[in-house]
């Protein structure tokens, strides 16, 4: 529960334990929940933090930015996780950070999927399935458009909007 002492939107679960690994790897894996952090740490993926089941906030992004400019979103493979990834991508980009996204199979999350694979196979899955934000959005949005020109146009506009929030003109 929220209180004057504890405000979930101001906390990244596991940050204290992960900060040295985030610096060492120059990358932060961002998950949704506590159990995801615990499972990934158990699998020796220690540069992992959670947004504590809340929508990602600018304050949380600033906390990560102190240690790395690279974030990989590992949200759940359900529609809610995909929607949260869409929202998070633009916020991370507008803070000037680099972002990639890993989508898990339908019905899986980092915790459940890490239990189905060996540690090495799970690490390989994370490496091989990281998509930059343009590829992530294009693949998902184009599946929805079904080659309808109006929907394709909306997809392109969505991607352009994401690019436009990048503060650095050269990166944009």
What is each residue range found by the language model?
Residues 98-171:
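C-terminal or mid-to-C-terminal helical accessory/interaction module adjacent to the motor/catalytic core
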Residues 61-64, 90, 128-132:
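Flexible glycine/proline-rich, aromatic-decorated loop/lid segments
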Residues 67-68, 89-91, 116-123:
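Short, hinge-like loop/turn segments at secondary-structure boundaries
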Residues 19, 65, 89, 111, ...:
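Generic hydrophobic alpha-helical scaffold/packing signal
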Residues 84-95:
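Conserved acidic, small-residue-rich alpha-beta core segments centered on
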Residues 35, 56, 75-85, 103, ...:
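Acidic, metal-coordinating catalytic cores used for nucleic-acid/nucleotide bond scission
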Residues 1-67, 71, 84-85:
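Phosphate-handling DNA/RNA-contact segment within nucleic-acid enzymes
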Residues 34-35, 45, 96, 102-104:
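Alpha-helical interaction elements
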């Amino acid at each position: 529960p929220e209180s004057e002492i504890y405000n979930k939107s101001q906390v990244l679960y596991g940050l204290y334990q992960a900060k040295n690994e985030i610096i060492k790897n120059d990358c932060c894996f961002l998950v949704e929940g506590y159990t995801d952090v615990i499972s990934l740490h158990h699998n020796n993926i220690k540069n992992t933090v959670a947004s504590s089941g809340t929508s990602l906030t600018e304050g949380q992004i600033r906390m990560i930015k102190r240690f790395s400019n690279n974030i990989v979103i590992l949200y759940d493979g359900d529609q809610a996780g995909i929607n949260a990834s869409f929202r998070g991508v633009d916020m991370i980009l507008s803070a000037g950070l680099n972002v990639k996204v890993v989508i898990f199979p339908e019905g899986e999350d980092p915790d459940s999927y890490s239990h189905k694979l060996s540690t090495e196979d799970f690490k390989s899955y994370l490496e091989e399935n990281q998509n930059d934000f343009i590829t992530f959005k294009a693949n998902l949005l184009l599946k929805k458009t079904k080659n309808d020109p109006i929907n394709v146009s909306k997809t392109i506009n969505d991607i352009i909007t994401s690019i436009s929030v990048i503060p650095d003109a050269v990166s944009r």
